[in-house]
């Protein structure tokens, strides 16, 4: 198991211990959810389709009108270096989720850029592949595409959290399926 004191996070050009990773309390990503993100994963220690994820991150940045202080290539290099710093913490059977987040920053400041790795809980979830995962259709609806583009990965996931709480009240371990306002299937709350 990866310990927080052993792993590193990239924050604004520096690689810091996870336990020392902080952002300002007045950051818009914290106070208003004013941030974008993308998530990719590794397979056998290699990041899968990183360039495509970075492209999507920049599409979300454009939608939210946040200017990245880093180029696509700089983020790609930073992500690879972060993985190099953290890969030794995993066994050869383990992999990472890699999260890239860019906040607007505080109202009088610059965007904050965070890249961090989280071990994939593959062993804990192996039972899902054998026996399935309990699901329920939530009464909580996905944010309307008229209010917020579903193509942009933004830090607005409170409806997913509420849907998961509803699913947990339905059955322990259950995940939620969210519909749109017209009753159409949109997506699951995550696993």
Kindly label every feature range from the protein language model.
Residues 187-191:
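Glycine-rich phosphate/ribose-binding loops and adjacent secondary-structure elements
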Residues 1-177, 181-184:
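Conserved alpha/beta cores of soluble small-molecule-handling proteins
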